[in-house]
């Protein structure tokens, strides 16, 4: 069996790992073993956080909608309940965008939601329309 010398492949592999680890702090950008370990962690963090980003954006949209809804004397919960009852199908991303860019349209949506809400005794006193 022929002897396999791996110097070219090994150098190529190490060079690619060190190139990918540019910008890391300290030894993690200079030493191959540390750089390889950090790169594995970095790729895991990237994979995990790409999924976590979706939930973070949803939280951001909900807090923006809630702030705009409370400015219109209704809670987020009652607003969403009213929009569902009225058959208004607008997702949270677009609703948050409307709340920021077009407050008049958001107020109109709040009025639609209020009209569709049932009058019940469990609603807070300031929200009964």
Curated annotation (Swiss-Prot):
InterPro entries: Ribosomal_bL20, RIBOSOMAL_L20_CS, Ribosomal_protein_bL20_C. CDD domains: Ribosomal_L20 (cd07026). The keyword Lyase does not apply. SUPFAM superfamilies: Ribosomal protein L20. GO terms for cellular component: ribonucleoprotein complex; ribosome. Residues 1-29 are annotated as: Disordered. Pfam families: Ribosomal_L20. It comes from the Bacteria. One of its GO terms (biological process) is ribosomal large subunit assembly. The keyword tRNA processing does not apply. One of its GO terms (molecular function) is structural constituent of ribosome. Residues 1-17 have a biased composition (Basic residues). Keywords: Ribonucleoprotein, Ribosomal protein, RNA-binding, rRNA-binding. NCBIfam families: rplT_bact (TIGR01032). Belongs to the bacterial ribosomal protein bL20 family. PANTHER family: 39S RIBOSOMAL PROTEIN L20. Binds directly to 23S ribosomal RNA and is necessary for the in vitro assembly process of the 50S ribosomal subunit. It is not involved in the protein synthesizing functions of that subunit. This is Large ribosomal subunit protein bL20. It comes from Mycobacterium ulcerans (strain Agy99). The gene is rplT.
């Amino acid at each position: 069996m022929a002897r396999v010398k791996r110097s070219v492949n090994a150098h190529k592999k190490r060079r690619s790992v060190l190139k990918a680890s540019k910008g890391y702090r300290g030894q993690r950008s200079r030493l191959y073993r540390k750089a390889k370990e950090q790169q594995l962690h970095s790729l895991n963090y990237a994979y995990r956080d790409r999924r976590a980003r979706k939930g973070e954006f949803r939280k951001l949209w909900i807090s923006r909608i809630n702030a705009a809804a409370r400015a219109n004397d209704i809670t987020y919960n009652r607003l969403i309940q009213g929009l569902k009852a009225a058959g208004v199908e607008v997702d949270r991303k677009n609703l948050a965008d409307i709340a920021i860019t077009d407050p008049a349209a958001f107020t109109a949506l709040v009025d639609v939601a209020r009209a569709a809400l049932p009058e019940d005794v469990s609603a807070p006193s300031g929200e009964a329309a």
